[in-house]
Amino acid sequence: YTVSATDNAGCVTSTSVTITQPPVLTVNLTATQPKCFGATNGFGVAAAFGGVPSYTYAWVPALAGNSATSNQVGAGNYGLTVTDGNGCTVTSSMSLVNPPAMAASITSTNATCFSACNGIAIATVTNNIGPVSYVWTGGASPVLSQTLTGACANTYTVLATDQNSCTA
């Protein structure tokens, strides 16, 4: 902008001013999904650019926190408002989704005779991530195997755990 002034004697003076604006405020939001069905270990990481530092962060719902990295949360929809040093705002959102629930099934063969300890049970899991460890309980001591052999008549329980610590 330029302004000019002329006095009574006809002398002219002028001056200019340039008004600038900061770069546009933007935010990049990266979501990390929960590792197990129903887990509360998902989170978001925001990176603000432009505007005028410093930045403040407000997640919705509030349980997600007020920093660039959200608190650990479960599946759901989350909003984020970033405010720069001039009070300008930008919003973004993310959706966290549960992975499919890990599930276990058991096939078994009963003991062949009364008091025989030759029963077999085999655990199978679906929706696991990576290798699975198995722990059978109900016998004299825990069995760390996918297959339970030499089982006497009893009720047995298996706990299957994958590499994300998801269980079934």
Locate predicted features.
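Proline- and Ser/Thr-rich low-complexity, intrinsically disordered segments
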Residues: 1-168
